[in-house]
């Protein structure tokens, strides 16, 4: 399910570089993480929903690429972000 505008605003306020920041890797990764968590909860109840499972795998791959980009370009921002999001790496 897509994020509501209120959810996006709260995520961007917490993780973005400024209040209208949607392009920074931190903001994109935070929004993808929220969508991944939502889809994961959905799949716990709907185990046979393979279309959503494929969408989840695509989102995880997109987030992995953004995390790799951030780790290659700025390790300090990368470490700070994974600590704030609670991701394991």
UniProtKB/Swiss-Prot annotation:
Q: Which family does the record claim for this protein?
A: Belongs to the universal ribosomal protein uS15 family.
Q: What protein is this chain from? A: Small ribosomal subunit protein uS15
Q: Record's PROSITE patterns?
A: RIBOSOMAL_S15 (PS00362)
* A cellular component term, taken from the record's GO annotations: cytosolic small ribosomal subunit
The record's Pfam families line, in alphabetical order, gives:
Ribosomal_S15 (PF00312)
- Whom does it interact with, and what assembly results? Part of the 30S ribosomal subunit. Forms a bridge to the 50S subunit in the 70S ribosome, contacting the 23S rRNA.
Which keywords does UniProt give here? Ribonucleoprotein, Ribosomal protein, RNA-binding, rRNA-binding
Name the HAMAP family on file.
Ribosomal_uS15_B
What superkingdom does the record give? Bacteria
Output the GO biological process annotations, alphabetical, semicolon-separated: translation
In which organism is this protein found?
Answer: Corynebacterium efficiens (strain DSM 44549 / YS-314 / AJ 12310 / JCM 11189 / NBRC 100395)
Please explain the role this protein plays, according to its UniProt record: One of the primary rRNA binding proteins, it binds directly to 16S rRNA where it helps nucleate assembly of the platform of the 30S subunit by binding and bridging several RNA helices of the 16S rRNA.
Any GO MF annotation of the entry:
rRNA binding
Q: Which InterPro entries match?
A: Ribosomal_uS15, Ribosomal_uS15_bac-type, uS15_NS1_RNA-bd_sf
**CDD domains linked:** Ribosomal_S15p_S13e
């Amino acid at each position: 399910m897509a994020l509501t505008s209120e959810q996006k605003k709260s995520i961007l306020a917490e993780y973005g570089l400024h209040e209208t920041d949607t392009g920074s890797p931190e903001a994109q990764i935070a929004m993808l993480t929220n969508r991944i968590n939502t889809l994961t909860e959905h799949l716990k109840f709907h185990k046979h929903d393979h279309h959503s499972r494929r969408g989840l795998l695509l989102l995880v791959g997109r987030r992995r690429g953004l995390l790799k980009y951030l780790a290659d370009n700025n390790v300090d921002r990368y470490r700070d972000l994974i600590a704030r999001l609670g991701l394991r790496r």
